[in-house]
Amino acid sequence: LKTSLKPKHNMRFLFSCLFLVSFFSVFSQEEVKPKIEPVIKIDSLYREDQFYFSVTYNLLSDIPKGLRQDKFSAGLSLGFLRDMPINKKRTFAIAAGLGLSYQNFFQNLTISKDGNGALVYAVNDYNEIVSNKYRQYMVDLPIEFRWRNSTYESTKFWRIYAGLKLSYAFSTKSILDDGETTYKIVNNSDVNKFQYGPYISAGYNTWNVYMYYGLNPLFNNIKTASGSSLDVKTLNIGLIFYIL
């Protein structure tokens, strides 16, 4: 009799195990798994506006009588500025960097040569010349103080930047065509190689106005053929764009 009861107990045990396995399987399937959201890292130690590009209209100030500009005298510059915030909110900063710039001037200040090869500066009427222009390429060293109302969550903000720029003119060229002779003066030694002046830029998001004024004259102690001092300075007005 004892032997005949053993299979029944074994069968009951087997069915009990199957029931428990099925129960836990159904329970685990109905269990709601929490949704895993991706972790977004926020850089609270951000820096702003470290690359720049500008387009300007170039003017000459402190000009002698009769000097005028014609056409569009364009200027281009680009460079890098290291942004160094000085407060916890990073709304104030100092920036210093390195850049390159190109300036072109169409005007009636002519540079020619006399019979001995000496340079002659004169202010001529436009009906006396076919074309006349001066251009220079420079390495720029800007340093500026910055204010902006930026946050690490937005790339759109107001800004006002003001600073001082020191430039070295590593290449200059003037071309005069008076209808009879073309004079090309390359790397004129009378040009101030080192030029400096204050600048300011201000705007919102992409669009920012820019202005630079040269403090020292474009030429060193030069007089025109009529005896007028040539103390012209540069003035650049235009737009500047910042990225990163």
Language-model region placement:
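Bacterial Sec-dependent N-terminal signal peptides
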Residues: 1-34, 239, 243
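Short glycine/proline- and aromatic-enriched beta-strand/turn motifs that initiate or cap beta-hairpins
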Residues: 29-83, 242-244
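Short loop/turn motifs that connect adjacent beta-strands in outer-membrane beta-barrel proteins
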Residues: 37-49, 85-92, 150-158
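Predominantly the C-terminal beta-signal and adjacent terminal strand-loop region
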Residues: 40, 46, 187-244
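Residues that define the transmembrane beta-barrel architecture of outer-membrane proteins
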Residues: 47-49, 70-76, 92, 135-141, ...
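Glycine- and aromatic-enriched membrane insertion/assembly motifs of diderm outer-membrane
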Residues: 50, 59-60, 68-126
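Extracellular/periplasm-exposed beta-strand and loop segments of Gram-negative cell-envelope proteins
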Residues: 64-71, 106-136, 169-197
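Residues on the lipid-exposed face of transmembrane beta-strands in outer-membrane beta-barrel proteins
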Residues: 78-84, 98-100, 141-149, 162-166, ...
